[in-house]
């Protein structure tokens, strides 16, 4: 059996998950048209065509997304593509980290769509019957297999490879801090780890405000010692800490865009906000204060962000309109220095970003209880 595999990136993923300097000289064509071109080109040479996609909305960096419907991103682009392609048997989707317990079959074309929630939490199993004499692919069954990695023995070959690199770079095992309880990510809400990282960035830069996209936080901190390797796992990117001057009105626009949740909520330090997620997009902010005082529209403030965000990553174009005050220190180095200074980490409290609609839900819950 010969299987043709076509890989494709979505337009939104191209523009909003790659820093602008990485896209220099590149253009992106319509993904469906491109896949159809290559499917037609290889159709006569294979028995089956599989498309691997990197599209739909950006994945939430949260390992419990299967049990948290609020962060599940859907697979609209995969579904639309499946309905407009001819001669493609399967689409296996990525990027959104959405999951389907059983594959979906598009009623128009019969194309099978499978997604596995991402981050190695599940394996996807699909079974097909293929008639090699004539072009005929029949879907038999498909399902997800949970990966309980903590219960599995280590693969010796992989462990040896990792440990050999640790020997080459012993500094990775340096203990740079200690935390008494886990610091966990949340994609659509403020998180303890997000508050900690932005506090440290604000301190390192000496800025009024720090802002970090939730998608940049790629791991949690477990309770106990924190090593340099774990810090790199949490923030694995090689960009510079960038401080930008923005007006109060521009900061409000920044926060309003964050509250539309296109790529999760922005994690913040230096600001306290109240918002209503049930209101229209770009009209959700109710109150915003800086160090307890009202943010002034015409006043200038310093805002520290990653180099990725400073270049408009994740759609934060407002950050490209500010005046760059500094961008000469690697982001990872800034975090490392702050961890080394603090050693024993104080768990940041929550409450910087209060969604009043959540308060209303809680109030209604208790008012209707049968105590």
Question: What are these model-derived regions, one by one?
Answer:
Residues 137-141, 145-226, 232:
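Hard-cation-handling environments
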Residues 104-112, 122, 195-371:
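Feature captures C-terminal
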Residues 1-150, 157, 188-200, 210, ...:
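Acidic, metal/ion-coordinating pockets
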Residues 14, 21, 70, 180, ...:
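Generic signal for short, ordered secondary-structure residues
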Residues 9-15, 98-99, 140, 168-175, ...:
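Basic, gly/Ser/Thr/Pro-rich low-complexity segments located predominantly at protein N termini
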């Amino acid at each position: 059996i010969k299987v043709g595999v076509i890989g494709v990136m979505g337009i939104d993923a191209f523009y909003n998950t790659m820093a602008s300097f990485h896209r220099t000289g590149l253009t992106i064509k319509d993904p469906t048209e491109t896949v159809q071109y290559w499917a037609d080109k290889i159709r006569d040479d294979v028995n089956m065509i599989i498309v691997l996609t990197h599209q739909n909305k950006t994945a939430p960096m949260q390992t419990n997304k299967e049990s948290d419907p609020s962060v599940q991103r859907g697979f609209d682009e995969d579904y639309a593509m499946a309905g407009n392609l001819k001669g493609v048997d399967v689409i296996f989707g990525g990027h959104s980290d959405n999951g389907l317990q059983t594959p979906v079959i598009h009623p128009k074309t019969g194309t099978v769509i499978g997604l596995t929630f991402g981050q190695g939490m599940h394996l996807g199993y699909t079974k097909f019957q293929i008639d090699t004499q004539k072009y005929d692919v029949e879907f038999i069954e498909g399902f997800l297999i949970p990966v309980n990695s903590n219960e599995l023995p280590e693969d010796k070959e992989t462990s040896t490879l990792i440990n050999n690199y640790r020997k080459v770079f012993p500094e990775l095992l340096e203990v740079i801090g200690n935390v008494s309880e886990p610091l966990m990510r949340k994609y659509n809400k403020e998180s303890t780890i997000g508050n900690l990282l932005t506090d440290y960035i604000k301190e390192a830069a000496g800025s009024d405000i720090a802002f970090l996209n939730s998608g940049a936080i790629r791991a949690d901190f477990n309770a106990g010692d924190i090593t340099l390797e774990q810090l790199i796992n949490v923030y694995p990117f090689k960009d510079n800490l960038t401080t930008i001057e923005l007006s109060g009105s521009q900061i409000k626009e920044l926060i309003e865009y964050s509250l539309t949740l296109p790529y999760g909520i922005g994690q913040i330090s230096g600001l306290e906000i109240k918002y209503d997620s049930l209101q229209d997009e770009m009209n959700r902010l109710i109150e915003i204060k800086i160090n307890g005082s009202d943010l002034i529209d015409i006043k200038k403030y310093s805002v520290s962000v990653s180099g990725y965000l400073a270049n408009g990553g994740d759609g934060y174009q407002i950050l490209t309109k500010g005046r760059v005050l500094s961008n000469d220190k690697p982001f990872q180095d800034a975090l490392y220095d702050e961890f080394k200074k603090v050693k024993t980490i104080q768990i940041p409290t929550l409450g910087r970003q209060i969604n009043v609609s959540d308060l209303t839900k809680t109030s209604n819950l208790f008012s209707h209880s049968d105590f």
